[in-house]
Amino acid sequence: MKTEILTLLRETDGYVSGQELCEKFGVSRTAVWKAINQLKEAGYEIEAVQNKGYRLVSVPDILSESELQSARKTRWIGEKIAFFDVVDSTNTRAKQLAEEGAPNGTYVIAERQDAGKGRRGRGFDSPAGQGIWMTLVLKPEIDPNHASMITLVTALAVSKAITDMTGRPAGIKWPNDIIMSGKKVCGILTEMSAQFDYVNHIVVGIGINVQNKSFPKDIESVATSLFIETKEHYHRAELVELIWEAFEHYYEIFLQTEDLSGLVNEYNSHLVNMHQQVKVLDPKEPFEGKAMGITPKGELIVDTWESRKLVSTGEVSVRGIYGYV
């Protein structure tokens, strides 16, 4: 009931009377009073005025299931939310839930990860209260060979959401990093369980530095946060909702064709590598060239002095000639 009351208070501009809450949820005034007090204890500022009722004044920056559900506007993402104060890795937990039958659109979110996962087995620093660490479960009926494009769909959604929230450009470093001022603010890790021609499930992990004021010496030259970039604090649950709204939109476009043909132009407009000299760290043979955008299959187009090459996602990294981007 706490979540339902919070949702109603969010949706109402003025006051909601105690009687209205009792009638709507079929509970006593004492039960309403207890739920309101629980919300206040969690950090919600709720004004109570005699003969008027209750009004939500402000919300805290917390990632509870009640907060996330009450802010939810998506159609199918987040019907089931698994919130944890601490997990080893949201990707690991999401895979477990997927294998146990969690429905499409379920997501795992945590205040802290003890063993966050990055690309190619790297760790991902995930301190409590500082960022958004979450993983979405997808169960699409697509060719497993097309699954890697979902990473690019996710990057586009995160780029748009951060740009919309902060008013600052958040670009994409192909294929899976979000960049502000030349530094990484978000990483994306997509993992799949599949048969030869069938996807069991896909999990899409997103890690965003939001409130961080500083970083360890070994990554401070390449990492940033929304706070560092704007000197403002952001309500993380609101950003989560913006990301999932954008993702639903872009993902459904992707599913229509199982490629990025409907998203290429928008993706390229967010691509920080676009028309930049890049170094492709291909294990077989590294090379340099100019990035010219992506193909409908999500490959990075790189023009070298002798030919045009198409770079696929996977074990290949792309760096700027003079730095990370």
Roles of regions detected by a PLM:
Residues 85, 172-174:
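Short loop/edge segments at beta-strand edges and connector loops
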Residues 1-27, 37, 41-42, 143-146, ...:
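Long, positively charged amphipathic alpha-helical accessory segments at protein N-termini or as interdomain linkers
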Residues 177:
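Conserved active-site carboxylates
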Residues 49, 127, 173, 294-295:
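A short, compositionally biased micro-patch
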Residues 2-163, 234:
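N-terminal lobe of the biotin/lipoate ligase/transferase fold
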Residues 103, 127-131, 173, 183, ...:
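Short connector loops at helix/strand junctions that flank enzyme active sites
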